[in-house]
C-alpha cells in the first residue's frame, strides 16, 4: 500500500505512518543516473512517476492537519512543499527522460492553480486540496489565512524548482515564486514564528531583482545567523551507542551542514559579490 512512498525517520528514532513522497522522490537518483546511466536507478525513478496516485488513499497530513478540522471537497490533500515539489521532481524527470508531455502538463496545471490562490504559496493552513488526476491544487477555506513552511525549500525542492523554471517559462508562476522568495522571511517571523533561516530564498530574490541590499542580507544571514557560538569540541562515542567508535562534534548536525553548504554553493553562483 505504500509503493512509491518512502519511510520518514526510521534512523535516529522509530518510524511512523508518515510515508512520504519526499523520501523516495526521483530527485535523489536523478544526478547519479545521468552521470552513470545506471539502469536500476532509472527503474527507481520510473517507479515513482505516478506516486501522487497514492494520495487518494494516504493523506500525508492526516495526523498533523486532519481533514475533519480543515475540510475540502478535493479528492486528496498535500502541502506545496515538500509534497507537491517532490511530485513535481518525479514528473519533471519522467518528462525529460521520455518526452511524455502529460507529466509536463500536470506540472503546469499545478503552477497555474497555485498562482491563482489568494496568497499564492502562502495560502491556507499548511495543506491544500489536490486532484491527482489533473495536478490542480485548490483551497476552500478562509481566504485570509496564510502560513509559511520552511520544508518547501529543503529535500530538493529549491533545486528542482530552479531547474524547472528554466524548462517551463510561466510568467504567473515566476511572479508567484519570486513573491514567495521575497516575502518568506518576514511572514515566517510574523505568521508562524519560525526562525529557521532559508537563506537561498533571499538570495534568489536578490539575484532576480538585482537588489544589492537583499544580497548583503543573504550573505550576512549565511555568516552570522547560521553561526553557532558554542565552542568547537570533539567527543568520543563508543560502542554500544554506535556500531563502531567515532569522534563527533555535538553542535554540528547533518541537516545544518548540508543546508548551509547548499546555500553557500548557490549564493556564490547567483550573488557572488
Q: What is each model feature region?
A:
Residues 1-195, 200-270:
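Catalytic cores of extracellular degradative/oxidative enzymes
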